[in-house]
């Protein structure tokens, strides 16, 4: 099963693609989509780039991190922009007839690291270990790969 994980952001969106077979993982690709310009330009870039990745790799499922707002630091403007980025990703998956699944950040961390409030460095380290990578991926790409790994653990 090919799984595309996506860590949404209006400025940086991470993506990571793995192939999973009976909890054996094969790393295929990962990276970060860096956007510039107005909000509509950034959202369009996310949609176009995710759509190109879907069309190139033909994943069976797209995994996206569920949005949340920290109660100790509410930022409605950031949440709305994140919602726009998520909408672009969901639209790209839908327009290419891909199954889309969501996991909470804590669920992803608990599955990959073993604790729901793991630090980004711990997630990156475990992604590197599980995928047998020579070096740790960029933080946003590592989060996306962690989402893909999480789905593999939950569905295989």
Where are these predicted regions, by residue range?
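Phosphate- and other anionic-substrate recognition elements at nucleic-acid/protein interfaces
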Residues: 1-156
